[in-house]
């Protein structure tokens, strides 16, 4: 946000905001701006536009609202945010909508672990930004789980940190 309280377009060492362009993208960006402004959050960093794939470590995750806030931030940056969900979420009449919203299904009933399933998901996509809450729960937890690291390492993608600073209401 600038001094007048308006959310500024991302700029700086990474250049412009991220990949998607077009009327629908701008509509989503506008909705994201309205949501972020309404709840009092602002963006404190630029998006690295030359990173087509990443694991985004999103912390802390202490509320269901954090997910919606991260989706709004992704809309502001014009990126599609992916997230892991159990495979049953993408089945049924609304499964297509869940998948379209960014869910990457994890099949828990197979012997293949989630890290390998995410590695395969990264391998089959041209771009993918997977948001992972390292706490593994919405409770305050100083001991992070390490799955995000293993996913990034096995997929050969960078880790990006997304920090929700509740004190200043700035996402960095």
What annotation goes with each model-predicted range?
Residues 2-43:
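Extreme N-terminal tail/first-helix region
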Residues 21, 38, 42-172:
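Soluble catalytic domains of membrane acyltransferases
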């Amino acid at each position: 946000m600038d001094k007048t309280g308006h959310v500024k377009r991302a700029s700086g060492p990474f250049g412009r905001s991220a990949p998607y362009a077009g009327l629908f993208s701008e509509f989503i960006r506008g909705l994201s701006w309205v949501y972020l402004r309404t709840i009092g959050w602002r963006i404190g960093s630029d998006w690295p536009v030359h990173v087509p794939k990443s694991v985004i470590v999103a912390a802390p995750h202490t509320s269901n609202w954090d997910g919606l806030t991260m989706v709004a931030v992704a809309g502001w940056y014009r990126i599609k945010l992916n997230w892991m969900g159990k495979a049953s979420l993408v089945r049924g009449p609304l499964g297509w909508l869940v998948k379209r919203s960014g869910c990457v299904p994890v099949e828990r009933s197979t012997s293949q672990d989630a890290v390998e399933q995410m590695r395969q998901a990264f391998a089959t996509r041209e771009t993918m930004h997977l948001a992972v809450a390292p706490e593994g729960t919405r409770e305050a937890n100083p001991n992070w789980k390490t799955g995000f690291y293993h996913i990034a390492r096995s997929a050969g993608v960078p880790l990006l940190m997304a920090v929700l600073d509740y004190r200043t209401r700035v996402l960095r």
